[in-house]
Amino acid sequence: MGNFIQPKGSTSTEIAREILSKTYSINYSEIDFIKQNLSVNGLKLLIDPNTQYIWGTISSLETGTISSWSIDSTGEIMTVLTTNGTLTLRKISVSTSTTTANSIYNFMTSDDIYNIKNVVGIEINVDYALQKAINSGLMSIYYPPSKGIYVHSNVCTLPSGFNMYGQSRKPYTVSNDASFNNCGTVIRLASGSPGIFVLSGRHTFDNIVFDGRNNTVGSMNATSQVSGCRFEKCGFYRWGIGLGRTSGYVATVYARGCNFSGNNTAMQDWIDSRAVDCTINAQVSRGIAMRTGANNNAWVGCRVEWNGTDGFYFYQSVGNVITGELIDRNGYAGITVADGASVSVTTCSIQRNGRISSNTNNGANILINDSGIILLNGNRFTSGVDDGGTGVLTPDYDIICAGGTGKILIASGNSFSGGNLGYMKEVTIANKVITGNYGLPDIVNTGTYQKSSGLVKMGNTSTGTLPPAASNGTLTLSLSRPAMTQYMIPQKIVLEISARDTIGGRAEYFTVPLLCSWESTVPVINMISSKLDTYPDNVWGPSTNTPTGVQVSVSTTSDGSTITINLVSMDTRNRQIQAYIRGA
């Protein structure tokens, strides 16, 4: 940072002294520029006119007048010879330029400044300095990069809109305290503290490394739900929750260019929030966890990899969006969507997930549990082992559907390479709209027109077993179609029935056109028996055709939205039946 640029002449002294007076809450008369024959009586701070560096102890200097002064080889200690003896002063701010930038140094003791600037890894609690800055009315403060570590212990409450800046490098992963040595601006949670400071909201934090020490609490401590906080180029390490509260929600968070590693969970329980260009790597547990009510969040260009369990975990959290980058080698599924949660995922590489979960329902790139909803578009799914060629080949499947019913999977324009055991495993059947993907065939099993195995169907497919005639062999199947309206133009559809004789091992089918109309008080379904096709011949048909195997009749509901198929066995065969309708 450059030095404070001052005008020449007496105005120079006046500006610098006025700035320092307000910053340190001391009298204007207690500050002066160092020079020969200057009386130090009553002075607290000296300014070097050549460098603009600030020297002193913020306590009254000795008496006497200055005859000479010198600075030691470290640049941190000034020796001043006066008519009454020798003064030893320490540099308490880099220059008056850091005063104009509201440096935390300006509120720290000279001993603390010296130690944090010169002792690698030393922890200096600066609660007192931050509180002094807040009390002075400042609304932004600069934490200079230091060899030591700034420590806070939840003593200070940041006023709404209070901002904090630093200069730091972000470690990719961390293992212990030494991982933070020489990282620049590092703020560490005090041992046993519930937070670093109490947030009020609308804060901006820029280029600071935040260390949670022991994975116990969330970094965003507040007395109630906090909102409007921005984090630019920050790092979050060893927190219980990297960005989030220990309990409760945070809203309208904006994180850009941040690194997260070594936390239990990097991000948790956000509302209406965004993360852009962030790296979420090697958390102890989940990368991201959005739970009940943590709705409407977006991740854009974020890398989520090598986390202990799930990469993304959504539970009863709706309206979420993931766009771009990499979701790779997480211990469980890359993305888990459960119990009514919903997420849209586009243009991501989703690969090698389920790293520690082979032969379980977590062994997938995507896991849909219970009534989860996921939309996939333009993504690339692959499997693989660790970067070095070791480890287990995962995932087992690109997609696993498990848990209860009601889940929804919509996928188009993706590339599926298949997991170790296949493309998709359905422990429970999902409502699927899967079209136009590489590797995964088109499947639509919901809505008016459905598709499977290359066949387009109208409504659902119905299955059942038709026992032999001697066993009171009857079966009723229901098929859905769009509701009919009175005086509609008649519509021809086709009923398709396939059957397997489980006793004789024989394959059978029955196809017949149906004419749907509504001219009187109720809709009518007419079977056009002259156009039916059956195999073997005359085994299937309406009663008027005297079939030898199965007698078929059809009826419909009062609005024509359901077609009922009634089957009656006429022989000794036991049949497995599948029926559907299609357009003519």
UniProtKB/Swiss-Prot annotation:
> Any coiled-coil ranges, and where?
none
Biological process terms from the Gene Ontology for this record are: adhesion receptor-mediated virion attachment to host cell; symbiont entry into host cell via disruption of host cell envelope; symbiont entry into host cell via disruption of host cell glycocalyx
GO cellular component terms, alphabetically, are: virus tail
Where is this protein localized, as stated in its record? Virion
Which keywords annotate this record?
A: Degradation of host capsule during virus entry, Degradation of host cell envelope components during virus entry, Host-virus interaction, Viral attachment to host adhesion receptor, Viral attachment to host cell, Viral tail protein, Virion, Virus entry into host cell
The UniProt entry, under Pfam families, shows: Beta_helix
Please indicate if the UniProt record lists Ligase as a keyword. Answer: no
Stated role: Functions as a receptor binding protein (RBP) and probably mediates the attachment to the host capsular exopolysaccharides. Displays a depolymerase activity that specifically degrades the K25-type polysaccharides of Klebsiella pneumoniae capsule.
Task: Report what the protein is called.
Answer: Depolymerase, capsule K25-specific
Species name: Klebsiella phage K64-1
